[in-house]
Structures are given as C-alpha cells and as structure tokens.
Amino acid sequence: MAPDRPMKILLTVHQFFPEYFSGTEVLTFSVAKELKKRGHEVCVLTGFPSRTHMPDEERFDEYDLEGMRVYRFHHAYVPMGGQTAVTEVEYDSHLTARYFTRLLRDLKPDIVHFFHMGRLGTGLIDAALAAGVPAFYTPTDFWSVCPTSQLLLRDGSVCAGPSRFGGNCVKHVAELTRGPAVRAVSRFVPTALVDAVAGLTAKGFLPQYPLRTEVAAMARRRPFNVNRLNWLSGIVSPTSLMTKVLRHNGVDVALILQSAYGIDIAAGDVAPARRVPGQPLTVGFIGTLARHKGCHILIEAFRKLPPAQARLKVYGNLSDFPDYATSLKALAGDAPNIEFCGTFPNAQVAQVMAGIDTLVVPSLWYENTPLVVYSALAAKRPVVVSDFSGLVEVIQDGRNGLVFKPGDVSALHRCLQRLADEPELLGVLSEACRRPKSSVEYVDELLMLYACPRAGTTPRAPRVFAPLEDTRGAGFITGWAVADNCAPKSVAVLRGRNVLGATDTFLPRPDVRDSLRRNGVTVGSEALGFAVTLKSAFAHDDLQLAITAQSGATKTLALSGLAIGASVALDEASYVGLDSARQPVTRANI
C-alpha cells in the first residue's frame, strides 16, 4: 500500500538537467515530477564535471529546477577530501559522503532513492543508513560492478564482469588512461597475473610500487559497492539482465524488485505507422553519439540501401565526443539522405517519433533497455535492435521489431532492406507495438516499495561521516608549488605568525611538471597543485606562503612579490606559482 501522507524524498543521479538529458536523467526527472504532482517534496543531489582545481568546500553549489532544489557536486579526476587514490574517490568519495551527511541532517528526508551513484559514491549509502533514512536504488547501467559502467572492453568486445580481484578492470582502465605504450604491453600480460597482483596489493602484502594505491582501490571496488547495495531497503532492477548481473556479483536477490522503467506518455491513442508504397523509409537514431552506441554501424548499413529507398535522421549531440562525431560525418559523406538533426527537448520526443518510420538501436554493449525504446513503442514505431538481452526482452524479432547480430553491418542492412522493400511489414510490426508502462504506473510501484521495504540478510555496519562544514562564500588561494624537486608536504597561508589556512592535499598538475622539465628542472611528482581555503578577509600583500618540503624544511615567501598568474623560483629546486584568489563573501551577499 502506498504512503498516504506527503513525504520529503531525496533523489540522486550522476548528472542532471539542464546540461544533461540522456536516459538516466530523463527517468530521474520524470519520477521527480510525478512525485511532486502527488504532493511530495522532492530534491536532487547530482554531479557535474569540473576541470578546475578548487578547494573541497567550493565543489558544491545549488540551483532550482521547476520547483525542485538541486544540490550539485563539481567532481574531477583529482585527489580530494583527504583521499589520494583517484580510483577510490570515484566510487567512495568521502567528501561527497560528508556533504550528503549534512544534507540529510538539514533536509531530514523520509526516503533516499539513488538513480546513479557514479562520482558521488556508494558512501552515500553509509550516510543514509547512519541517519536512519531508508534508501533504494534503480541501476540504469552496470556502474556498481564495472568501473566504465558498460561491461565493454576497449576492443569493442563485451566483458563478463570483474575478475576475482578486479585484475581485468586494472588492465582495462590502464589501457584507456595510460597511453599507447601501456596498451601495447598490456595485451602480453596475463589477466590472471594482474589479478593476483591486485589481490595481494589490496591485502597489503606487496611493497610500494607506482600506482599501488590505485590498483588496491580497484581491487576493493566491486566488494565495497556490492556490500553497500546489500544494505539497501530495495533495488528496482529494470531488466532480467540487470538482475542476473547483480545476482552474479553477490547482490542479495531478496532485495530486488524487477520492474521496467516508466515513461511520460501523451494521452490519447496513437495511430500505427503506415508507409505509402513508393515513399522512402525514414530511419531514426536517437541517442548519445558515442562508439558503444553503434551509430557508425547503422550509417554503414544504411549506405548500402539504394538512396531513393530510404533516409536517415540522426539525433544526438555532435559535441559530446567530437572525434567520433567527425568519423560519423565522414562515413555519411555527402549522402543527401542522411541528416544530423542535433538534440531535442524530451517533451518533443513524440513529435520526433512521428517523423520516422522505424527506430534503430545498434548498440555494441549490454544495453539496459534505453528509454528511447519505450518511447518508440509508445509511438507505435517498430525498433530494430542489436541482439542483447536488455533489448530483446522488449523487442521480439518479427513481432514489434527486428533483431540483428551486434556489430554486423550486413545483418543490419538486411533488416533495413526488408523494411524498405516491404511497406506492409512496417504496418504489421507497428500494430504489435504495445503501450509501455507510464511514469504514473512506475511511481505507483515505487511508492508501494517505499511503504513495504525489502529486507536483506547482510549485517549493516555503515560508517559515520562528520557533516561537511558549510563554507559557501569562503575565500581561497590556488596555485602550485615544488619543494626540493618534489611535491610539498604542506602549504600554508600566513599573516604574520597567524595561519589563515593550510593544506596537505595536492592535485595533479602535469602541465607544471612538464613545463619545468622543458626548462631542465626535474620534478618527481605531478601532484603540485594546491587550494587553501581562507575564511577571513585578507590583503594579498600582507600574506606569506609557507612551503614545507617532505623533509620538513620550510621556505616562506612574501606574496607582495608574487602576483596572481606569476611564478617564482625560491631556489634551484623549489618553485611556486599563483593561479587565483578570492575574498570571502559574506552570507548576506551570497
């Protein structure tokens, strides 16, 4: 039975409107809007990529979206929150958990529902349980067990999931992030060997070696995440594929409710697709223009059709992955029947569907039934899909669509040729398209789950995080420093003998390291960037910067001699530069 009183519900998602509007964001937003319609108070915690170095406390801001308060974390692939392993920060951000702890204290929600925890971390589950708030999860991809979220290897083949100690994940991530030399060597290193090394590293049995903390963090990733999923009050799995993956990786099946997504559906009946003989077939692609989505497979297959028989509309953001988008444009060439249409507001999805005859989802990964498939079915548009479990659970070959072998250009071409040659086939498939679940029905199910949570068997032992102090409006000084040809031990900002702020956390600045090396200065680390928070007003020329080396020796520099944007040598092995500074802002002016 659904709750009969208004509740305060806190949703989380890795990225959100208005900048991001793919399937997970659309699902989260539609659930939020439907909950609000029913009188519940809804707020959202989300993430946003930041390429700038900033103090930890400055990584959070807020905004309003259609009557909902959205709390935003500006993440980056750098150490933060006292954690030095970037791999660990991605799935267990202590900084975000501390901020979430403060949100839970201030908002006092009745329910937390996670729609994605990428870059936010499963430490949020610790925080929710420590606050006594029931927490639920809807996995929209495989992030909880796969560091790339897709179970897809660099060569395009699908992955069975992490090995025992994540050694295959260590290899895969290294191949993606460490350049061509690592990729060339990696294929000759047995995964079993990497797995053994990762396991011994995680247990502390091996001595220090480069990237040791990152390898250990990767080895801990899956068991850490799965353990926390087993503390939840319910998991809403959208497909049997997702249920299988979760169960295979150790998630308690008693927690799982399998329920397909719901979508916003326009009222009224929708006419089946009809095509007049002699008119070209209009094929549509709607989605992220990234290689794993397979749009290149579609364009290659489409170009095998006689130009007069069909036209192709590609909807997606060309700037998300510009190199891939350029390759798509090259594949399309000057074909007059291929159109790149950009993006569109989700409210226009029915209008876009009305402008195509069939949707193609040529994915190269284990798609978890993208929302666009349900939107096509709602519009009675047959769907041509890759033969992956998450897709063929919804699309049956020859009934409401066609199915082809993933990545097989010829097989997809044959499907498209059939639709082009047989106008009546489109009508038959369209008639069989059944109305999918609506957002209203989906939220009905969620509210019933909230009222009757599921019980797992894993003992709960959540960590307790201290709430992150609210320092919005604090000032700061950012820059970089080298002490004795290495990263400093600490940097402090002084006014006379008073310490105004200090940090012992340093951020990657490969640009600084490389610049110094070009000038003949050897630097043993790229972790040279600093950000010092300052809570009281300051005059730049009255400050000193104290740079402490790993040896404990300290050098002090008067900032009156160093302007923002400038750098200076303290001696032949120590250097410092300033990037930015900001005065504290009073609360009244925020």
Predicted regions and their residues:
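Conserved acidic donor-binding segment of nucleotide-sugar-dependent glycosyltransferases
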Residues: 397-398, 402-409, 418-423
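A charged, aromatic-enriched C-terminal amphipathic alpha-helix characteristic of glycosyltransferases
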Residues: 424-452
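Short hydrophobic beta-strand element within catalytic cores of glycosyltransferases
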Residues: 358, 382-385
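Donor nucleotide-sugar binding/catalytic pocket of nucleotide-sugar-dependent glycosyltransferases
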Residues: 144, 164-270
